[in-house]
Amino acid sequence: MPTSGFVRSTGVFMMAPSAAAKTPITIRLCGPRGFCAGVDRAIQIVVLALKEFGAPVYVRHEIVHNRYVVEGLEAKGAIFVEELDEIPPEHRKQPVVFSAHGVPKSVPADADERNLFYLDATCPLVSKVHKQAMRHHRMGRHVVLIGHAGHPEVIGTMGQLPEGAVSLVETVEDADVYMPPDADNLGFVTQTTLSVDDTAGVIKRLHERFPNLTAPAADSICYATTNRQEAVKQAAPGCDLFLVVGAPNSSNSKRLVEVALRAGAKKAVLVQRASEIDWSTVGDISMVGLSAGASAPEVIVNEIIEAFRDRYDATVELADTVEENEHFLVNRELRHVELTGADMAFVNGE
């Protein structure tokens, strides 16, 4: 690793610090990290809708689980609501965007009833899970959904099928006691943002109890979740402190904290901004790991690096695993709209 000059990693430029009377530390920066293709697409849909239709554009639920992103979109004219009945009658000709996490079938049906124009920003990989669940159901199987109760993605997936057609299993302990309506006719799908290792344990236990359990045609856990967890696994050993940039309601970010601890980090913490770091508890450190959940923008990663540089003689070590090139198209209604350089910087989390 050079001791001076610029080092570039996924859009981040880092000036290696000159010698100073500060404690030297290394920041091990994971790659890939931050925005995935589904998050990028969802944010882009809201920005494009604002350019095409003007403010306000309503968004049902946080478009992605990150306050920095949500507040940035609010500043541009987006209004976030939890339910469609919060949209005032005088604004019902304005578009409403469904979040990247997906929605139950009842939500677009409700929008149609209210004569609302909606744009679905559901991540295509979440939509794939919906299709997998519906295929199990068409084949006459009861669907087991491995996921976290109350998460918007789980609510959306369960809402694709009639009530009672899906059972939620969260843990190996749940799998131990689960009693299906027909043990010989089961199919499973998973939430896309789970711990890869934890999910494998749940699936293994379900297969032990129900040998005829049918897997989906393709893995439900998304590429970005898998890649970020693998990068953290490789970077965490030897870290005195591991920071994950992400929101407390971000499933994939919380899983990264768990992965870091299991992989050998002495301490792992979830933070939304550099201002949340409790420096009084950091203690003696020489190696810091840093990653970001799939809905966390790169600008906050840079903010945290600079916060460490203010206090330490920090050198950044890149811990890249795989390169991500995935890209998802936005809705047809928006493909003709052009974004400025500033728009793209926001969409890319810069």
Curated annotation (Swiss-Prot):
[4Fe-4S] cluster binds at residues 36, 123, 222. Binds 1 [4Fe-4S] cluster per subunit. It comes from the Bacteria. Isopentenyl diphosphate binds at residues 65, 101, 151, 250-252, 295. Pathway: Isoprenoid biosynthesis; dimethylallyl diphosphate biosynthesis; dimethylallyl diphosphate from (2E)-4-hydroxy-3-methylbutenyl diphosphate: step 1/1; Isoprenoid biosynthesis; isopentenyl diphosphate biosynthesis via DXP pathway; isopentenyl diphosphate from 1-deoxy-D-xylulose 5-phosphate: step 6/6. Its cofactor is [4Fe-4S] cluster. GO terms for molecular function: 4 iron, 4 sulfur cluster binding; 4-hydroxy-3-methylbut-2-enyl diphosphate reductase activity; metal ion binding. InterPro entries: LytB/IspH. (2E)-4-hydroxy-3-methylbut-2-enyl diphosphate binds at residues 65, 101, 151, 192, 250-252, 295. GO terms for biological process: dimethylallyl diphosphate biosynthetic process; isopentenyl diphosphate biosynthetic process, methylerythritol 4-phosphate pathway; terpenoid biosynthetic process. Dimethylallyl diphosphate binds at residues 65, 101, 151, 250-252, 295. The active site is at 153 (proton donor). The keyword Membrane does not apply. Keywords: 4Fe-4S, Iron, Iron-sulfur, Isoprene biosynthesis, Metal-binding, Oxidoreductase. Its EC number is 1.17.7.4. It catalyses: isopentenyl diphosphate + 2 oxidized [2Fe-2S]-[ferredoxin] + H2O = (2E)-4-hydroxy-3-methylbut-2-enyl diphosphate + 2 reduced [2Fe-2S]-[ferredoxin] + 2 H(+); dimethylallyl diphosphate + 2 oxidized [2Fe-2S]-[ferredoxin] + H2O = (2E)-4-hydroxy-3-methylbut-2-enyl diphosphate + 2 reduced [2Fe-2S]-[ferredoxin] + 2 H(+). Belongs to the IspH family. Catalyzes the conversion of 1-hydroxy-2-methyl-2-(E)-butenyl 4-diphosphate (HMBPP) into a mixture of isopentenyl diphosphate (IPP) and dimethylallyl diphosphate (DMAPP). Acts in the terminal step of the DOXP/MEP pathway for isoprenoid precursor biosynthesis. HAMAP family: IspH. NCBIfam families: ispH_lytB, PRK01045.1-4. PANTHER family: 4-HYDROXY-3-METHYLBUT-2-ENYL DIPHOSPHATE REDUCTASE. This is 4-hydroxy-3-methylbut-2-enyl diphosphate reductase. The gene is ispH.
